[in-house]
Curated annotation (Swiss-Prot):
Binding positions (a divalent metal cation): D99, E100, D204
NCBIfam families in UniProt: rnhC (TIGR00716)
Record family assignment: Belongs to the RNase HII family. RnhC subfamily.
Protein name as it appears in the record: Ribonuclease HIII
Cellular-component GO terms for this entry: cytoplasm; ribonuclease H2 complex
EC number: 3.1.26.4
UniProt catalytic activity: Endonucleolytic cleavage to 5'-phosphomonoester
The species this protein was found in: Lysinibacillus sphaericus (strain C3-41)
Cofactor annotation remark: Manganese or magnesium. Binds 1 divalent metal ion per monomer in the absence of substrate. May bind a second metal ion after substrate binding.
GO terms, biological process: DNA replication, removal of RNA primer; mismatch repair
InterPro entries: RNase_HII/HIII, RNase_HII/HIII_dom, RNase_HIII, RNase_HIII_N, RNaseH-like_sf, RNaseH_sf, TBP_dom_sf
Cofactor: Mn(2+); Mg(2+)
Amino acid sequence: MSNIVLSISTNIQKEVMAYYAANYIERKAAGVIFAAKLPDTSITMYKSGKLMFQGGGAEREAARWGTIEKTPNSKSAIIGAKGDTLPDQFALMSVLGSDETGTGDYFGPMTVAAVYVPSSKIELINELGVKDSKMLSDDYMRKIAPDLRAACVHSVLILRNEKYNSLQAKGYSQGKMKAMMHNKALHNTLAKMAPETPEYILIDQFAERGVYYNYLKNEREIVQESVYFSTKAEQLHVAVATASILARAAFLKEMDRLSDIAGLELMKGASNKVDVQAARIWRKQGEEFLRSITKWHFANTEKARKMI
């Protein structure tokens, strides 16, 4: 199915609504101000000025109103992105994406989210405020996460510190843990959305394809069909950007919980300030407590030990 998005002015919006008035259909979705249905084309207009055409006649109808908007369709479209070459118009396709956060933070969990965004919801998700999470504040991500969870089929996994440390002590690398979580989150989401299937799956790349699947060689169920890997994947499809936000929101919620237990606001990251805070907690509440809220194998542990 073809999907085309145009940016149109307020005047053109009025013309579009008049032209398709006889084909009007009611569509109750955030950001939608008009929708119409032709035998071979669905037309959706958004408050943002975006006009989306879907179906066999999308190109024909879009040509009436403007120039087709160019969208990123491969890793070369995003400066610095590395990984698989994506299909043309990938950004407009129905994609299941996954991303993780918390991997570089001494305190708190590692979280992974997988999110399915069908082509019909891409503009809705954009209307809800999704961008590359690195461009958004934590407070903003907390704010929009509930709407995103309600709008999309998804799975969010949290690997808390006790389990993380247990796996690490058994010889699991962080890369292996991430691969297992991505695979599980993708599998969960595919199960929830069945019998519908995505056109493609995009994983924000943290390991080469061969390394990733080697991590999963002992897993019973491995998601492999139509899977692409790319760095900066959150800029290549809104599904990964949404996954990044949901993973971050889950991480922040868990950090709130741990901060309440610790009696102070835990710092993010793994800086020297984190070392100082860790040493303070160690002196006051002991090694076992500190271990229960941290990724114990990080270098911060030994740095904090020297400060006690």
